[in-house]
C-alpha cells in the first residue's frame, strides 16, 4: 500500500497571471502558501487483479481502464501503464472551495503511482507532469499555480516565464514574523462549490480581449512583487492593504468571481477589523481569507460568527509519501 499526502494552497496574490494566455504575453507570478489541509491518495493491488477499483465521491469498478469515467484517474493510469489497483482519495476539505484541491489530487495521484512503480519523481517533475495532465491531456484551463504549490509546499513566489518554464523562490522571513502572519490570516467558509475552469476561461478571454481587464491583471502582478518585498522585510501588516487592492481588481475580471452577498460579507469583515482579504481560488464560492491584526481578532470573530472559521497552520513539505508497505 502507498499513501501520499498533498497540501491544499492559499493564494495570496497574483492568481490569473498563471494562465497561458497571459503569461505567454507578459510573464506572470503568484505568491502563495500551502496549509495543513490535505488530499490523501491510497493505492494497493486489487483483490481481483483484472479489476481496477476507484473510490472518490463515487465508486468505479472497471475491467478496462479506458472505461473509467474520472478523467484524471483514467489518463494517469494509462500514462503509467497501471491497472488492477484499488485507489482511494480522501480530502480534509470539499472540492470546489478555492483551495486548489483538484490539482492537489492530480499531484498526489502522480506521486503515488510513481512510488507504486518504485520510480522517483522530483518536485519540479511532478508539478510539470500535473500541469501537462490538467492543461494538455484533459484540457482544463486552471493555469499552473495550483500544481506547483501542491508539489513544492511552503510560502513561495512562483514566476511563470513567457517560454512556459516556472521559477520557484521561497519567501524568506524571520521566524517571529512568519508565525505572526500565520496567526493574522483568518479563513471563513462562505459555502457553495464552483467550477474554477469556467471562471478562469472567462477571465482568460477577458484578459485577451479587453484592455482594462489586461491592465488590471498586470497591476495584480505588480502587487505580487510588492507583497514579496514586504514579506521578505517582515512587514506583515502590508499584507492587508495589498489583499484589499488585489480583491477590488480581481472581482472585476470575470462575472463569476464575486456577487452582492460576497461583497456584503467582505465589507462586514473590513468594518469588523480586517485590513484586507479575498475570496480564495478562482472565485464564486468557498473561503474568504482575511488579514486581521491580532488585537482586532476578538471583535472580528464575534461580528463574523455566522460564517464558520476553518483554523489552519502553514504546511512546509508539499506532496509527500507518508506510508509504504
Predicted regions and their residues:
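Short active-site loop/helix that positions an aromatic residue
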Residues: 25
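Residues at or immediately flanking beta-strands
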Residues: 84-86
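Aspartate-rich (DDxxD/NDxxD/DxxxD) Mg2+/diphosphate-binding motifs
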Residues: 94
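C-terminal nucleotide
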Residues: 1-11, 18-21, 30-32, 38-81, ...
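Short, small-residue alpha-helix embedded
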Residues: 103-117, 285-290
Amino acid at each position: 500500500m502507498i499513501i501520499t499526502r498533498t497540501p491544499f494552497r492559499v493564494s495570496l496574490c497574483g492568481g490569473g497571471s498563471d494562465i497561458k494566455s497571459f503569461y505567454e504575453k507578459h510573464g506572470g507570478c503568484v505568491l502563495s502558501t500551502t496549509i495543513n489541509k490535505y488530499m490523501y491518495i491510497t493505492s494497493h493491488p486489487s483483490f481481483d487483479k483484472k479489476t481496477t477499483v476507484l473510490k472518490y465521491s463515487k465508486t468505479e469498478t472497471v475491467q478496462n481502464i479506458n472505461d473509467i469515467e474520472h478523467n484524471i484517474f483514467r489518463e494517469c493510469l494509462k500514462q503509467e501503464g497501471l491497472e488492477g489497483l484499488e485507489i482511494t482519495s480522501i480530502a480534509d476539505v470539499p472540492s470546489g472551495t478555492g483551495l486548489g484541491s483538484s490539482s492537489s489530487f492530480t499531484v498526489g495521484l502522480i506521486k503515488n503511482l510513481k512510488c507504486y512503480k518504485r520510480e522517483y519523481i522530483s518536485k519540479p517533475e511532478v508539478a510539470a507532469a500535473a500541469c501537462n495532465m490538467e492543461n494538455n491531456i484533459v484540457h482544463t484551463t486552471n493555469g499552473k499555480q495550483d500544481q506547483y504549490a501542491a508539489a513544492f509546499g511552503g510560502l513561495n513566489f512562483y514566476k511563470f516565464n513567457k517560454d512556459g518554464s516556472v521559477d520557484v523562490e521561497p519567501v524568506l522571513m524571520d521566524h517571529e514574523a512568519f508565525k505572526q502572519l500565520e496567526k493574522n490570516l483568518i479563513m471563513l467558509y462562505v459555502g457553495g462549490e464552483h467550477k474554477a475552469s469556467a471562471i478562469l476561461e472567462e477571465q482568460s478571454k477577458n484578459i485577451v480581449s479587453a484592455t482594462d481587464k489586461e491592465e488590471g491583471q498586470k497591476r495584480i502582478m505588480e502587487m505580487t512583487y510588492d507583497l514579496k518585498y514586504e514579506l521578505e522585510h517582515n512587514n506583515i501588516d502590508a499584507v492587508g492593504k495589498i489583499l484589499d487592492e488585489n480583491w477590488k481588481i480581481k472581482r472585476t475580471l470575470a462575472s463569476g468571481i464575486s456577487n452582492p452577498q460576497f461583497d456584503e460579507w467582505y465589507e462586514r469583515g473590513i468594518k469588523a477589523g480586517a485590513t484586507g482579504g479575498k475570496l480564495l481560488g478562482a472565485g464564486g464560492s468557498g473561503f474568504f481569507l482575511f488579514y486581521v491584526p491580532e488585537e482586532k481578532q476578538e471583535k472580528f470573530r464575534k461580528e463574523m460568527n455566522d460564517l464558520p472559521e476553518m483554523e489552519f497552520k502553514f504546511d512546509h513539505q508539499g506532496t509527500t509519501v507518508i506510508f509504504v508497505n
